[in-house]
């Protein structure tokens, strides 16, 4: 039962994780690095361009990627996310956080097929980053069994685990329903996928359900 896991001890988790910061401004990269170090992170790499970031992800596997949406010239953060997903350089057990000053729905939603795990808006304070990272790391640790099966393309097993998580009264209900709909779609079960989208829209107005 996934939801019965003890609360994640973040102070013990940070030193074990690897981080990649992608931003075209050196001062911002340095600021984020200092914040992560203060949380206990020890393995922190940085990139100033999309090309360098994708190269790094080809040779190294990062647990957490913090990527600015607007990188100036070349690919933006959304395009990096899409390329990493398509080339399977970014596992579902990893976390991709989009950093953006943009607040429009078009940017926040991005390409519906490839969405980041979370967003953080500039300017970023240490408190805000610590809180957001803590939420995402806790979620990822609790849902790791599901994401591990997705990475292995064991979609039927992932569906079973998602259903168990929902039965256990998970706090990540929206994520589970969204993931279930995607998994049914991958298995060609459009009937169940459509049912989830419709059921969700009858209770809450969620962008991903409307897009589905």
Regions found by a protein language model. Name each.
Residues 145-212:
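C-terminal output/effector regions of signal-responsive regulators
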Residues 91-105:
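A short, hydrophobic beta-strand element within the central beta-sheet of small alpha/beta folds
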Residues 129-140, 145:
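Receiver (REC) domain switch/output surface
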């Amino acid at each position: 039962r996934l939801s019965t896991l003890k609360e994640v001890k973040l102070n013990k988790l940070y030193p074990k994780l690897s981080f990649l910061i992608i931003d075209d401004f050196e001062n911002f990269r340095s600021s984020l690095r200092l914040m992560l170090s203060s949380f206990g992170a020890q393995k922190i790499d940085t990139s100033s361009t999309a090309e360098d970031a994708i190269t790094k992800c080809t040779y190294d596997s990062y647990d957490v990627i913090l990527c600015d949406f607007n990188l100036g010239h070349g690919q933006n953060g959304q395009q990096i996310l899409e390329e990493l997903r398509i080339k399977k350089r970014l596992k579902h057990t990893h976390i991709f956080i989009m950093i953006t000053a943009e607040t429009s729905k078009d940017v926040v939603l991005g390409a519906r097929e490839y969405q980041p795990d979370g967003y953080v808006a500039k300017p970023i304070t240490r408190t805000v980053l610590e809180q957001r990272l803590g939420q995402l790391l806790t979620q990822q640790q609790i849902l790791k069994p599901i994401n591990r099966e997705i990475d292995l393309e064991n979609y039927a097993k992932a569906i079973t685990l998602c259903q168990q998580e929902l039965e256990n009264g998970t706090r990540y209900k929206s994520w589970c329903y969204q993931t279930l709909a995607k998994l049914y779609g991958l298995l060609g079960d459009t009937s169940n996928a459509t049912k989830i989208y419709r059921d969700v829209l009858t209770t809450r107005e969620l962008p991903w359900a409307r897009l589905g």
